[in-house]
Amino acid sequence: MIIYFAIYCFLGYLLESCYVSILQRKWISSGLLKGPFIPLYGLGALLLILLFPYLHTSYYLSFFVGGIAMTILEYFASVYIEKAFHTRCWDYSRHPCQLHGRISLFYFIIWCFLSLLFIQYIHPFFMSLNIMNDSVSLICLIYLGFILKAFIDRLQFHKINGLDIH
């Protein structure tokens, strides 16, 4: 699972950075942490992997249940990030059909399509690579170490600057 977490953190970073860069018309390195990874995408991927046995046989389930699961994760991640880091990484309050600016109908639909692609095509592709060998595991553990270090650095930055972290 660590391998998949690392891969999908990186792919999520690429996806989000490309999306934001297209909107801004210049390269933007997305994410709360420094480095080429966004843990929310890794967590989302792990959630979908846990649901995979129940969803992969149906495009409809992959689409709707995956989208609902990812939207719920996005909501609670937004709450956690705001409380832990005193920052808001996204704000959908100007979108129609949104809830507390944390989730919106537009991004729910995006999550539905991404969940469908992930469950039906992306994750089966990575499973077929049979990447569970020692060297890849070592690389992923090192990568996970970078993610943890970036997270710890972020917490220490807030602590040094006198911000309350819960």
Spans of features found by a protein language model:
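Aromatic-rich, lipid-facing transmembrane alpha helices and their immediate juxtamembrane interface loops
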Residues: 1-166
